[in-house]
Amino acid sequence: MNAIELSWWQLVLASSLVVALAACTHFARLGLGRSLLVAAARTAIQLALIGLVLEALFAVGSLHWVALMGIAMLLLSGREVVARQKYRLRGGWSFAIGTVSMFISAFSVTVLTLLAVIDPHPWYDPRYAIPLLGMLLGNTMTGVSLGLDRLTESARRSRDIIENRLMLGETWADACSDFRREAMRAGLMPIINSMAAAGIVSLPGMMTGQILAGSPPALAVKYQILVMFTIAAGTGFGTFAAVATCARRLFDDRERLRVDRLTAG
Amino acid sequence: MAGLTLERIAVGALKDIHLDVAPGEIVCLSGPSGSGKSRLLRAVSDLEPHGGTARLGGVEQGAVAGHRWRRSVMMVPAESAWWFDSVGEHLHKPMPEALEALGFSDETASWSVSRLSSGEKQRLALVRTLSREPRALLLDEPTANLDETTTRRLEDWLLPLIRKRRLPVLWVAHGGEQIRRLAGRHFRIEGARLVEEPVRT
């Protein structure tokens, strides 16, 4: 790696651009200046902290600490899924469904990719495991939260349709099949779009970062393809599991639609 | 064909509702709005949690899966919902005679549901339900959006069919005239109970 060293004062220079933007929006009375500055400050602080954590983690490199880090990331993304719901299931079900489906998909895809494709030594080498898991969780989280949000919203909005189908003797799965399909589509659209546009419209963030950090483009491309495929698989399986479980939970054991199990998030 | 029995049904304000509807019999329910007529039908259809149970012949509500119960005991709501593009896609089999009897034609099956009037929806919802061959019917004001002529036309088609198929029917109705034409028996909801009213004076 022959990355050009980036010093903190150079970042200060970059931050002055954000400050300038905030000043402009402030004078134009757009009311965005404050949240822009807060978000920029959060980026700097959070990433600096995670940088320290990763340095320490890479130095220790034990399976325990990697696993602990993975679980912390999982729980935080589970919380994030719930926060993005307009309506959520009562009694912590949204958190549970989101977390479990992300665990099943993101963790198993990460482990599978580490073992079967990248094959570092040891297999849980945090230098590979953590970034890969992070990217998978981030994208699966988007898919799961979009999927769940769409499903619960249509259950409320289209209650008449679902119940009328139940009245005609359809099973709960048939009665909500259209809405499950819509929810899956909503969850998977971002990754399908970014796979289709990769390299043509956009240079994916990870690849750009790698090239900037000095990797040869050919290698960066291979890693990017790998990441795209694992993200697609992780998002797809995660969204599928979450939407299927949530749909089941919207009906009780008598196959009645129970919108009373939803509460405004 | 089997009769429909309500045993100790409790839902909303209604408590301890007992009712036997014989095969081929129409029992009319009436009561002020908000008295729980629709909820009673929903409870019999097992669409919402309720106390007590219902029975179709020897089969108890809770003994079969929800969708199997509702495949026998079908409810037609006051406001029907439509999910496919065309009318025909909602029918389980072509219903040329029913459509003709209600003033529609063969072409109606290809109509787009987005252009149906509320009266058309109401009649077609009934055709849609009967195309699935229910064994009991729960009708929630099925003629509320129809004018007098269309109402009579619907009754002239539906009543013989109910008798021929020997379906037990719970029919939520408003007008006293209509109840006199249809009902074997008539119950008015009063508070938590059903009070039997004379049908013919």
Regions found by a protein language model. Give the residues of each.
Chain B
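Helix-to-loop junction immediately C-terminal to a conserved catalytic motif
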Residues: 45
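ABC ATPase NBD coupling module
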Residues: 60-74
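Q-loop/switch helix immediately C-terminal to the Walker
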Residues: 72, 79-98
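Conserved ABC ATPase signature
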Residues: 112-116, 120
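Hydrophobic anchor residue at the start of the ABC signature
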Residues: 126
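Catalytic Walker B motif of ABC-type/P-loop ATPase nucleotide-binding domains
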Residues: 137-141
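H-loop/switch region of ABC-family ATPase nucleotide-binding domains
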Residues: 172-174
